[in-house]
């Protein structure tokens, strides 16, 4: 099955990036969009990470009755493409009323759900993109995947990012 032409154009419009975005760049991007599109956006702090970083959520309005979509980047802090993807989607939705109308949602976008983990990966985000450099600056939390399962036999506390997303989905 072929992709719709409008979606192929959206994909083709994604630009190149010389490096991945860190916590500060993702936060700046959300703040810039909120300032540039105040008639359709709201930027709120929806929580705080374990180390005191703000968890920011950009809401992009839809039409009354539209369902709400939650998008969040970096559920795994060593996968920074998610932050750039969330930020790109937010920018496209803000800039293009036709795209908002086509997708018919109210959007809640958190560009970085794990700023503490991303900060620990910032050493490799700008390169050089070699295995050695990546390995020397790599961080990923140890343990099982518990983001959406909440408590498990390995943990007694649901991760902060999971609690924030669960609250936003309601």
Located regions from the model:
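Short glycine- and acidic-rich boundary segments immediately preceding or forming the N-terminal edge
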Residues: 1-56
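Short beta-strand-to-loop junctions in surface cap/lid or active-site-entrance loops
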Residues: 57-65
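Gly/Ser/Thr-rich loops at beta-strand to alpha-helix junctions
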Residues: 49-51, 77-80
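Short beta-strand element of the alpha/beta-hydrolase
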Residues: 67-76
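Active-site-proximal beta-strand/loop segments in catalytic clefts of secreted hydrolases
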Residues: 46, 74, 111-114
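Hydrophobic side chains in beta-strands
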Residues: 59-60, 71, 111
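Active-site/substrate-binding loop(s) of hydrolase catalytic cores
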Residues: 66-67, 80-84, 88-170
């Amino acid at each position: 099955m072929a992709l719709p032409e409008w979606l192929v154009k959206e994909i083709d419009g994604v630009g190149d990036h010389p490096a991945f975005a860190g916590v500060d760049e993702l936060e700046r991007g959300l703040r810039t969009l909120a300032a540039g599109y105040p008639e359709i956006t709201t930027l709120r702090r929806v929580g705080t990470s374990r180390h005191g970083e703000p968890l920011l959520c950009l809401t992009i309005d839809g039409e009354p009755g539209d369902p709400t979509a939650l998008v969040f980047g970096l559920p795994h802090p060593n996968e920074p493409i998610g932050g750039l993807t969330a930020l790109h989607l937010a920018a496209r939705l803000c800039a293009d009323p036709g795209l908002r109308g086509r997708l018919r949602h109210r959007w809640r976008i958190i560009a970085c759900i794990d700023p503490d983990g991303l900060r620990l990966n910032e050493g490799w985000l700008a390169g050089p993109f070699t295995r050695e450099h990546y390995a020397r600056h790599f961080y990923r939390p140890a343990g099982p995947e518990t983001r959406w399962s909440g408590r498990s036999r390995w943990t007694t506390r649901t991760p902060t990012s999971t609690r924030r997303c669960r609250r936003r989905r309601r």
